Amino acid sequence: MRDLAAEIRVTAVPAPAVALWWLGQLSFVVKGQGCTLGFDLYLSDYPGNVSRAYPPLAKPADLAGLDIVFCTHEHIDHLDPWTLAPLATASPDAVFVMPEACLPLVKEILPSGRVVGSKADTPLRIKGVEIWPIPAAHDRLAEGETGYACQGYIVRLAGITLCHTGDTVMYDGLIERLRERRVDVLVAPINGLDYFRTKRDIVGNLSAREAAELAVAADVKLLIPAHWDLFAGNAENPGHLFEHLARFHPEQPCHYMARGERFIYCSCPAGG
């Protein structure tokens, strides 16, 4: 079996480029020169949780060397206590970034000095990485006393601007936020929402078509779809996304990531 944790550690990424690994759902590791980020890492499979379609692709205790770990909202497949606790031990220098509304959920799990509460549209700079938190609408914008409880993160790493939307549907202002930051790589959910899943208390996301149209409208250089494969009752066929792009926007780059795939994105000019 492939050792993803070891592969992440030994992969050398020259600037201006980043390496991405997809670990299922919206779980990603992004590595640039001198810094490694984790997004919504969900690497547990405990009784009582919703059954996974496949086992975790890595053990959190093996993921050493992470510098910043993002959790976009409170749902367990995005903020997983059984992942965060061993991850904090394996990567003792990691800083954990999450919406301020999530801070009480990790009070007994993570050292307070290593946790940063984010507010949407209030930029951060951590370990040299520029971070712009943005609202996420899951499945509506919810702003409370501590700000938006669900957020996405735009990061600038090794000359690349990447947006991990978190769980979200479309809302006024999302396109403009992405365009303002000139996003290179957009990671977005495509599992959609519908009446029947809503009746089962499954909170929805962008559909494949909406994710495609968002990428085009925001003029992003590459779309990576996610959040479509892990739970049988909330899955989607990614082929719908590629069919839509092929018919209506054949000029929009989009990359299908296999489970555990390492993908290198480079912004080098042609011939450079």
Annotate each PLM feature.
Residues 23-27, 31, 124-184, 202, ...:
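Catalytic core of the metallo-beta-lactamase
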Residues 3, 8-11, 32-74, 81-89, ...:
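Pre-active-site segment of Zn-dependent metallo-hydrolases
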Residues 12-59, 68, 146-166, 185:
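Conserved beta-strand hairpin/beta-sheet module of binuclear metal-dependent hydrolase folds
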Residues 95-97, 101, 169-259:
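Cap/insert and terminal regions of metallo-dependent hydrolase folds
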Residues 30, 40, 73, 80, ...:
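Divalent metal-coordination and catalytic microenvironments
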Residues 2-15, 98-160, 244-269:
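Metallo-beta-lactamase
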